[in-house]
Amino acid sequence: MVRSVWKGPFVDGYLLGKAEKVRASGRNEVIKIWSRRSTILPQFVGLTFGVYNGNKHIPVSVSEEMVGHKFGEFAPTRTYYGHGADKKAKRK
């Protein structure tokens, strides 16, 4: 379900402050965030965020194509190892 247009995009308040501090300092450092639910805004383009996936922070470099998506989309929480191989088929 899509968020109402009149509400605008959701971004945690502390996130805007962190992004402004890094941009003002001029250093290209990873901004650690836990807010996977926040929307990526145009002012985040060019910055690198460490998005928490429940285990560690995954570095996500924000590009133009990511604007409007959520941070959680770019840091998977589950590791897929594939389906188990068929042992009977290998013996033949």
From Swiss-Prot:
The keyword Transcription does not apply. One of its GO terms (molecular function) is rRNA binding. GO terms for cellular component: cytoplasm; small ribosomal subunit. Pfam families: Ribosomal_S19. InterPro entries: Ribosomal_uS19, Ribosomal_uS19_bac-type, Ribosomal_uS19_CS, Ribosomal_uS19_SF. Keywords: Ribonucleoprotein, Ribosomal protein, RNA-binding, rRNA-binding. PROSITE patterns: RIBOSOMAL_S19. One of its GO terms (biological process) is translation. Protein S19 forms a complex with S13 that binds strongly to the 16S ribosomal RNA. HAMAP family: Ribosomal_uS19. Belongs to the universal ribosomal protein uS19 family. This is Small ribosomal subunit protein uS19. It comes from Bartonella tribocorum (strain CIP 105476 / IBS 506). The gene is rpsS.
